[in-house]
């Protein structure tokens, strides 16, 4: 699908160019493929790592197969995590990933479950009459959700997730994730940063909690953002300890990227 401003459609070259332009040390990516035919059998998070010059990366599958086509939940024989320093084998799958230039000391995974029911979801589709994708509603079954975390040698643990689009279910998942993030932070003596597509509008991710949203910016759709679904949450960073990175469309995602620079 053509995503403005990229008029040539998705490609590995476009991915490398977009990731390199972000000039980031750590990236958390959602909705990525691992050895799936629809993306030419590419390990997308490894390609992301290559584009940004990162050694460490990990992919955590949500499902085996392709969403919206044929997929199944993971079973006991499926690897829960594939990283740059592992030799595990995994069938074509879909999930989330992290790539980091900063050394990763330990990877973590948390299962968040899924909604037993789906719901109509607004998604971008090809348009025959416009260079901008059209928006339409389709009924979508919710896939299993999870969180992937990387404990870094710089004193931070980065948490990545893609929560359910079903109201209420996503709030329950976020509550569980926040609790886990604080536990991991305490165990590793690191500061937690929670990143990802939370499928929740502004203020809801931090309501009635000690967490704060470091970036308040509409992120979806990327060619004319009307709502914020993507966040960077912290339970302890002060405004003078970070600055917000510039935001611009990448042409490879229907979401805008957000980022912060930690000030030392």
Regions found by a protein language model. Give the residues of each.
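N-terminal, active-site-proximal structural segment of metallo-dependent hydrolase catalytic domains
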Residues: 1-93, 171-176, 250, 264
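Conserved beta strand-loop-helix elements of the APE1-like EEP
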Residues: 50-53, 77, 87-107, 152, ...
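Beta-strand-turn-beta hairpins that frame and shape the catalytic cleft
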Residues: 92-110, 116-125, 141-160, 262-264
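Active-site beta-loop-alpha substructure in enzyme catalytic cores
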Residues: 144-148, 153-183
């Amino acid at each position: 699908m053509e995503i403005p401003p990229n008029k040539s459609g998705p490609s590995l070259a476009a991915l490398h160019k977009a990731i390199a332009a972000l000039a980031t040390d750590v990236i958390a990516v959602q909705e990525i493929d691992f050895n799936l035919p629809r993306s030419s059998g590419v390990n997308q998070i490894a390609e992301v790592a290559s584009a940004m010059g990162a050694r460490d990366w990990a992919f955590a599958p949500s499902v085996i197969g392709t969403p919206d086509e044929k997929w199944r939940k993971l079973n006991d024989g499926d690897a829960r995590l594939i990283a740059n320093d592992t030799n595990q084998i995994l069938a074509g799958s879909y999930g989330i990933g992290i790539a980091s230039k900063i050394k990763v000391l330990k990877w973590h995974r948390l299962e968040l479950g899924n909604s037993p029911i789906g719901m109509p979801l607004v998604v971008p589709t090809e348009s025959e009459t416009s260079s901008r994708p059209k928006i339409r509603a389709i009924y979508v079954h919710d896939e299993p959700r999870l969180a992937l975390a990387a404990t870094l040698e710089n004193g931070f643990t980065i948490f990545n997730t893609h929560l359910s689009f079903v109201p209420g279910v996503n709030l329950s998942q976020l509550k569980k994730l926040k609790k886990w993030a604080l536990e991991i932070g305490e165990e590793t003596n690191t500061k937690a940063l929670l990143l990802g597509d939370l499928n929740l509008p502004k203020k809801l991710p931090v309501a009635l909690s000690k967490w704060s949203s470091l970036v308040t910016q509409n992120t979806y759709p990327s060619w004319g953002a009307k709502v914020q679904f993507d966040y960077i949450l912290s339970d302890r960073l002060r405004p003078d300890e970070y600055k917000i990175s510039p935001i611009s469309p990448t042409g490879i995602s229907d979401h805008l990227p957000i980022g912060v620079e930690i000030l030392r």
